């Protein structure tokens, strides 16, 4: 299968690209290489004859059209994805996440692409409950995004679904929970905490630290995406969570333990504006396709910490350039 992977130099996109190539698929990565896109994530496949990289933006309709020609399928990762950055300046989120998605929908139709998997997020549902176990969103629940980031992702979902209902766009949408693993840009909470702790720096904890997230290992998420690509119904949405709900405080304390650091490094900070209390999704629909998360959270976290310990040359330049 010849697949176009937009945003394939990012965290999840690069992991999925490597999975596809290992499976024998032909992959074209199309990435704008903004601050979170990094070709070092793809070094192990850059000489593979089944891999090709195109430097381009999903808002560049002409270049995207030239790139998509001849592909069998598209997996659309390309997005601006950091909540705090969206609060500071929503403009690039609107452009990339909304206009970029509309461009891709047009070109999938024009080029008669067989399958289009759109990568969304559990954040489009908004917050649910205040404690672990207090309900979960299903795919039928209304979208109530809270941040400019999640609002643009919800808009992108609706754009893609509107193209399905109006034009028969062969799209399936997957809404994963929070991801973690190697090669994640160090502004995100887990790599931010790990890299700070490895350097003896404080870990900034918003508010009371009791906001809850469900954590899924990136390898499990890649398997979920592949399941939707191969088995997902057109016009359907699939939640993909792992059931590893943790408060941010619990997460910080576990990472302090794994990094052999001191709890005094936890530094409470002013809460994020509009901070969602808890995300939780019901993943029964994708379970019916045969996907179930396999990675134990604590073991996955240990492996992730070890990766950042062994790969300072990867994250130190990224962290320094983003400060």
Predicted features along the sequence, with ranges:
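N-terminal Rossmann-like NAD(P)+-binding domain of SDR-like oxidoreductases, especially those catalyzing
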Residues: 1-179, 310-323
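C-terminal substrate-binding subdomain of Rossmann-fold SDR/epimerase-dehydratase oxidoreductases
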Residues: 3, 103, 197-323
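Residues that form or flank phosphate/diphosphate-binding pockets in enzymes
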Residues: 12, 37, 62, 184, ...
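A short, amphipathic alpha-helix embedded in the catalytic core of nucleotide-handling enzymes
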Residues: 20, 163, 192-196, 224-228
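Residue-level recognition of oxygen-bearing side chains
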Residues: 63, 73, 92, 99, ...
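Short beta-loop-alpha junction of Rossmann-like oxidoreductase domains
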Residues: 127-129, 182-184, 188, 285
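The catalytic Tyr-centered alpha-helix of NAD(P)H-dependent dehydrogenases
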Residues: 145-152, 176, 182, 186, ...
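A conserved short alpha-helical segment within the catalytic HATPase_c
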Residues: 160, 190, 194, 252-256
């Amino acid at each position: 299968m010849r697949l176009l992977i937009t945003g394939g130099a990012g965290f999840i996109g690069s992991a999925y690209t490597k999975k596809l190539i290992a499976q024998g698929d032909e992959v074209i990565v199309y990435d704008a290489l903004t601050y979170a896109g990094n070709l070092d994530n793809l070094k192990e496949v850059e000489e593979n004859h089944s891999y090709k990289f195109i430097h381009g933006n999903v808002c560049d309709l002409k270049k995207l059209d030239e790139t998509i020609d001849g592909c069998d399928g598209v997996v659309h990762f390309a997005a601006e994805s950091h909540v705090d950055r969206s609060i500071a300046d929503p403009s690039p989120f609107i452009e990339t996440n909304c206009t970029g998605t509309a461009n891709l929908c047009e070109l999938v139709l024009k080029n008669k692409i067989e399958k289009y998997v759109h990568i969304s997020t559990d954040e489009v549902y908004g917050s649910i409950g205040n404690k672990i176990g207090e309900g979960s969103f299903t795919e039928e629940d209304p979208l109530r995004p809270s941040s400019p980031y999640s609002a643009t992702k919800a808009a992108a979902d609706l754009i893609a679904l509107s193209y399905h209902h109006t034009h028969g766009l062969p799209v399936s949408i997957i809404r994963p929970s929070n991801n973690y693993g190697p090669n994640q840009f160090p502004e995100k909470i887990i790599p931010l905490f790990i890299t700070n702790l490895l350097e003896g720096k404080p870990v900034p904890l918003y508010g009371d630290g009791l906001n809850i997230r469900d954590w899924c290992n990136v390898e499990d998420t890649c398997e979920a995406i592949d399941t939707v690509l191969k088995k997902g119904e057109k016009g359907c949405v699939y939640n993909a969570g792992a059931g590893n709900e943790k408060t941010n405080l619990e997460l910080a304390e576990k990472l302090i333990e794994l990094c052999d650091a001191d709890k005094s490094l936890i530094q409470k900070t002013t809460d994020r504006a509009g901070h969602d209390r808890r995300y939780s999704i019901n993943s029964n629909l994708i379970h019916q396709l045969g996907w179930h998360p396999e990675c134990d959270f604590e073991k996955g976290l240990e492996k992730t910490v070890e990766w950042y310990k062994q790969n300072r040359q990867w994250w130190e330049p990224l962290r320094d350039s983003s400060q």
